[in-house]
Amino acid sequence: MQKNTEPVQEAINITPSQQMIASSMGALLTSFFVTPLDVVKIRLQAQSKPFIKGKCFVYCNGLMDHLCLCTNGNGKAWYRAPGHFRGTTDAFVQIIRNEGIKSLWSGLPPTLVMAVPATVIYFTCYDQLRDILIRSMPERAEIASLVAGATARLWSATLISPLELIRTKMQYRPLSYKELRQCIQSSVAKDGWLALWKGWGPTVLRDVPFSALYWHNYELVKQSLCQRYNTLQPTFAISFTAGAVSGSIAAIVTLPFDVVKTRRQVEVGELEMFTYSQKRSSSTWKLMRAIVIENGFGGLFAGLIPRLIKVAPACAIMISTYEFGKSFFRKLNNERQLKSL
C-alpha cells in the first residue's frame, strides 16, 4: 500500500511550478555535462569524414537531438581550428588547450531554447499524469509509469516538432519574421498542416517506447533500491543508479528506431532546407528495410556503445538532479507547513 500512496503524497507536497523548476535545473546540468561528449564525437567524425557543405548532421545536448547544417566544407561554423586528434581523450585535451574550454559547449545555447522547455513539459507532465493515474486506478498502479511516460513524451514531441522544423529552416539562411511566416504558409498550403510535423513519426517511434520503458524500469529499480537500503525517499545515489540502468535498457531496446530516426531526421532536414529539391523523403519502414538490405539485421543496432555512453549518463544526471530538486522542495514545503501550525 505504501508504494501506491507515496506518489499521491508527493504530488500534494510539490506544486507543478516546483516540478518545473526542478526539471529545468536538471536539464541545464545534463546539458552542461553531456554536451562535451557529443561535441568531441562530432569533431572526430568531421576529422575522419569531413562534412559536405549543405549537409546535415545530428547534434545532441543530452536532452534532445538537433539537426545542424554544415554551412561550409571545413565546418568552421562549429570550431576555429580543424585539429588532428588521436582519440577521444586527445580530442578533449587539444580542444581545451588550443581553443579554450568553452569550445566543448559549441552550439549549446541555441539548442537550449527548445530543449529546456521540452524537458520541463515532459517531466512535469509525467509526474502529474502518473499521480492522476494512481489515484484513478490504484489497483493498476504498476502500469501508471508506463502509460504516463509514453503519453508525456508524445505530448512534448508533438509540441516541439514544428519549432524544431522552423529552427532547421532558419539555419540555411536568416529569415525575418515576415519571411518565416510566408515560408510556413507556403509549406502548409502545399502539404497541409501536417507539413509542420515532418519527421514527427520516426521521433515518436523511438522516443515514446523509450520513455515508457525508461520510466517503468526506473520506478521498479528505484523501489527495489529503496527497499534494499530501507529508505522511503530515493537518495541521490539511488536515483543516479536507477536512471543509468533504466536508460541503458531503454536505449538498447529502442536502438533500431534510433538508427532509422537519425537517418530520416537528416534526410527530412535536408529536404526542408533545400525546398527546391524534388526528392521525396522515404518512409520510416522503407528506411528500415533499406538498412537491413545494405548492412544486414545488425545494421539496425549500429552505434550501440556510443548511444549507451551518451544516454546512460544523461538519464542518470537528469533524473538524480530532478529527484534532488523535488526532495528539496518537499522539505521546504513541509517546513512551511510546520511553521504555519
From Swiss-Prot:
GO terms for biological process: mitochondrial transmembrane transport. GO terms for cellular component: mitochondrial inner membrane. InterPro entries: Mit_carrier (IPR002067), Mitochondrial_sb/sol_carrier (IPR018108), Mt_carrier_dom_sf (IPR023395), Mtm1-like (IPR045315). It is found in: Mitochondrion inner membrane. Keywords: Membrane, Mitochondrion, Mitochondrion inner membrane, Repeat, Transmembrane, Transmembrane helix, Transport. Its main location: mitochondrion. It catalyses: glutathione(in) = glutathione(out). Pfam families: Mito_carr. The chain crosses the membrane at residues 20-40, 104-124, 143-163, 200-221, 236-256, 299-319. It is a multi-pass membrane protein. Solcar repeats lie at residues 14-132, 140-224, 234-328. Belongs to the mitochondrial carrier (TC 2.A.29) family. Probable mitochondrial transporter required for glutathione import into mitochondria. Glutathione, which plays key roles in oxidative metabolism, is produced exclusively in the cytosol and is imported in many organelles. Mitochondrial glutathione is required for the activity and stability of proteins containing iron-sulfur clusters. This is Mitochondrial glutathione transporter SLC25A40. It comes from Xenopus tropicalis (Western clawed frog). The gene is slc25a40.
